[in-house]
Amino acid sequence: MEELKELRKEIDRIDEEILRLLNERAKLAKRIGEIKSKANLPIHVPEREREIFEKILRLNKEVYGGVFPQEALVHIYREIISACLSLEKKIKVAYLGPKATFTHQAALEFFGFSAHYTPCSTIRDVFVEVETKRADYGVVPVENTIEGVVNYTLDMFLESDVKIAGEIVIPITLHLLSASDSIENVEKVYSHKMALAQCRSWLEKNLPSVQVIEVESTAKACEIALEDERAGAVASEVAAYTYHLNILARNIQDSGDNFTRFLVIAKRDLKPTGSDKTSILFGVKDEPGALYKALEVFYKHGINLTKIESRPSKKKAWDYVFFVDLEGHKEEERVEKALKELKEKTQFLKVLGSYPKALLQE
């Protein structure tokens, strides 16, 4: 027991040292904010954040043996950076709402709890908030591994001049939530149609006699569950904390390989980090081999394409544009050359942005 006492004393000493260093970091962040403000420099620099994350993860693994989990380290440093940044300026983030949805969760994972968040009713509203500078950033869903692409997000890039400034990939884990503490009390289950579709087998097997009801969002389902102990909601863990609901069953989604990718949008371009993606859209003539000739450019320059998606151009029937994600930054020599050649082989080319790849997804 004496050894346990000594170890706890050592933990107390370390905690005090961590607290001292956090306050030192906060003081430095405030000084940096003052310098940036005088020089009229952007307060938030995502490229610098990426540099910090990569350095911390590398040190943890290579120098300290990786005893502390990498994913937990990302979450901790996200909040440290978010809190320090708020001492310089509170970042304003618009996202597809309502609160406690997966888009809200993605935004929190990217910007931390110290940012100021504005839920929007539609994807268009998120774009408008950023375009009009009422928000510094926006967060919108773009694709799900099971449900596919979010077409409305892609369509918005056809008409908007905002840039892609980041991506977030999160696992979609669904739980059965309720104000009751027993699953036996649940008579009705509410959720968004997509969430219900993704856990249909579990519901049929475990709650075969329960009425399943679609509502406009997982957040709405939680609001209903909060008011009625006989109601259950299918939603995220963030929703459980937000609405103070009990988690009656965890991970009830039918597929374990369910991820959603979100895009961060902004008004400015980002500098290279050394681990970037570039998103573009282009149109080609309606003739044989036109798309092949366009895509051949990337093969020629040894550039890997991670995604290609077609959408109607909305200008005339059977006229399509192509959305492409590729590895590398637009300022890299090979990417710059490829995009220059692509412009000559297409009817139009629009670079949507170059941005750091999602952390821990490489």
Curated annotation (Swiss-Prot):
UniProt-listed PROSITE patterns: ACT, CHORISMATE_MUT_2, PREPHENATE_DEHYDR_1, PREPHENATE_DEHYDR_2, PREPHENATE_DEHYDR_3
Residues passing through the membrane, by range: none
Catalytic reaction(s) noted: chorismate = prephenate; prephenate + H(+) = 3-phenylpyruvate + CO2 + H2O
Record-annotated site: Essential for prephenate dehydratase activity: 260
Single GO biological process annotation from the record: chorismate metabolic process
Entry-linked SUPFAM superfamilies: ACT-like, Chorismate mutase II, Periplasmic binding protein-like II
Classification via Pfam families: ACT, CM_2, PDT
Location of the ACT domain: 279-356
InterPro entries on file: ACT-like_dom_sf, ACT_dom, Chor_mutase/pphenate_deHydtase, Chorismate_II_sf, CM_dom_sf, CM_II_prokaryot, Preph_deHydtase, Preph_deHydtase_CS
Prephenate dehydratase domain boundaries: 93-267
One Gene Ontology MF term: prephenate dehydratase activity
Predominant place of localization: cytoplasm
Domain Chorismate mutase: 1-92
UniProt-listed Enzyme Commission number(s): 5.4.99.5, 4.2.1.51
Gene3D superfamilies named in the record: 3.30.70.260, Chorismate mutase (1.20.59.10), Periplasmic binding protein-like II (3.40.190.10)
Pathway field: Amino-acid biosynthesis; L-phenylalanine biosynthesis; phenylpyruvate from prephenate: step 1/1; Metabolic intermediate biosynthesis; prephenate biosynthesis; prephenate from chorismate: step 1/1
Cell location: Cytoplasm
Residues annotated for substrate binding in this entry: 8, 25, 36, 49
Keywords annotated in UniProt: Amino-acid biosynthesis, Aromatic amino acid biosynthesis, Cytoplasm, Isomerase, Lyase, Multifunctional enzyme, Phenylalanine biosynthesis
Source species, domain of life: Bacteria
Function, as annotated: Catalyzes the Claisen rearrangement of chorismate to prephenate and the decarboxylation/dehydration of prephenate to phenylpyruvate.
Protein name: Bifunctional chorismate mutase/prephenate dehydratase
Organism of provenance: Aquifex aeolicus (strain VF5)
Source taxonomy: Bacteria, Pseudomonadati, Aquificota, Aquificia, Aquificales
Gene: pheA
